[in-house]
Amino acid sequence: MEKWWLNSMLSNEDLGRRCGLSASLGPIGNTSGSEEPITNDNEKNIHSWSGRGSYSYSNVDYLLGLDGVKDIWSLISGDTFWVRDSNGDSYSVYFDIENKIFEIDTDSYFLGELESLFSSYLNLNSGSKDYNRYYDQYVYDTRHSWKNHINSCIDSYIRSETNMDSCISNGSNNSSDNYIYSYICSDSERGSDRGSSNLKTSVSDFGRHSDLDRNLKYGHLWVQCENCYGLNYKKFFSSKMNICEQCGYHLKMSSSDRIELLIDPGTWDPMDENMVSIDPIEFHSEEEPYRDRINSYQIETGLAEAVQTGIGKLNGIPIAIGVMDFKFMGGSMGSVVGEKITRLIEYATDRSLPVIMVCASGGARMQEGSLSLMQMAKISSALYNYQSNKKLFYVSILTSPTTGGVTASFGMLGDIIIAEPNAYIAFAGKRVIEQTLKKTVPEGSQVAEYSFHKGLFDPIVPRNLLKGVPSELFQFHGFFPRP
């Protein structure tokens, strides 16, 4: 276990108000005076704090006799944090993620002694650059790697210890209002030399492995970024449009979330909701029958098929829109998907509506054989009539991943083709190309930015602008808001 000296951006008053914690919540060593003993695995490492005025000074004497700065941390063992809030008050926070223990001590006497002696000890060793360098590296180097770990642990166990779901959210979407955000000391010291530190690597690896190990156990609390492996609090992830708060990576969105993002509230009118596949070629599978697999995805996603189609308003402009869902059999295009998209385009043709297709697919569905390949021609034929004969406007939005038959048909037929940042866009996947051609595919050659520079599509639009850009395009082409 590692120990850290932290400053907290959450005051004692806020902590008590949000989490319903009293000034002394059964802290380490039971300083609250409660008769009920507190037991945890760290008692052997945490020295006696019992009694308001009877602290053992043997610990303080030991602090003064340390041979190295590293041993200072033995005074605060396990997951115990010395915290100073924005008001300058000090307290300790202890949490044990395995045994589900969360304790806070707000007694300022001992912590004041600890802080004073800690500062005195550093002053005594101020002549040694090695000691200061070790301390600087130990305290400052790991702010980024431990930020999410501390936030998620404290946030989770405040809820579990107080049985209050409402203590997390106060009506604000700002994550800094909902987490206990901690940072290592002050901003002015962040520029300290870190190049030769071995601690940075070891602690960063420890934090990353801890996140990975706990991802399954606490998967209901967070979403892990597939790019940087940072943790994003699940409760607020949808409000952040599934964008990683750490690196800005655009993670996959469900079709329902995309409809909520693009369509004005109260204007969504779905089409052909109950159209389902009937296994037209009676596909044989030794593992799971095709119909059973369809049923399992329907239960898992709540959708009838891999695409949702309908009409609605985008910033007041009536549109027809189809949104593919990669969670439903990889967004594969079967006969039902092709039929729903074709009907949507024909409906928009008859009513002179602009069309948006949001693509997220692995390609044609192999369980339907040549019938799935026919959908490419059928949709393309409907689009030809829509674009060439009726002179209407079609916008294609390519998200990650867009591959196979979708890329080879309606995905690349838009009058304007928009891509999301870092979207995986290709006809054949990297593994298929390498196995077929026996050649290595260069890293990054199938992401949106690479294809953009080759002229494959038009703009790359971040998700937070994805509603505004099509709206401006529609108005430029003569489609305006209607009451």
From Swiss-Prot:
- GO molecular-function annotation terms? acetyl-CoA carboxylase activity; ATP binding; carboxyl- or carbamoyltransferase activity; zinc ion binding
Q: Name one GO cellular component term.
A: chloroplast stroma
Residue sites binding Zn(2+) per the record: 225, 228, 244, 247
Matching entries from PROSITE patterns are given as: COA_CT_NTER
Q: Which InterPro entries match?
A: AcCoA_carboxyl_beta, Acetyl_CoA_COase_Trfase_b_su, ClpP/crotonase-like_dom_sf, COA_CT_N
What EC class does the entry list?
transferase
Q: What is its EC number?
A: 2.1.3.15
Concerning Pfam families, the annotation shows: Carboxyl_trans
Example GO biological process term? fatty acid biosynthetic process
Q: Which cofactors must be present for this protein to function?
A: Zn(2+)
The pathway where this protein functions is: Lipid metabolism; malonyl-CoA biosynthesis; malonyl-CoA from acetyl-CoA: step 1/1
Q: Where in the cell is it found?
A: Plastid, Chloroplast stroma
Top-rank lineage group of the source organism:
Eukaryota
Q: Record's PANTHER family?
A: ACETYL-COENZYME A CARBOXYLASE CARBOXYL TRANSFERASE SUBUNIT BETA, CHLOROPLASTIC (PTHR42995:SF5)
Q: How does it assemble?
A: Acetyl-CoA carboxylase is a heterohexamer composed of biotin carboxyl carrier protein, biotin carboxylase and 2 subunits each of ACCase subunit alpha and ACCase plastid-coded subunit beta (accD).
Protein's name according to its UniProt entry: Acetyl-coenzyme A carboxylase carboxyl transferase subunit beta, chloroplastic
Q: What is this organism's lineage? A: Eukaryota, Viridiplantae, Streptophyta, Embryophyta, Tracheophyta
- What gene codes for this chain? accD
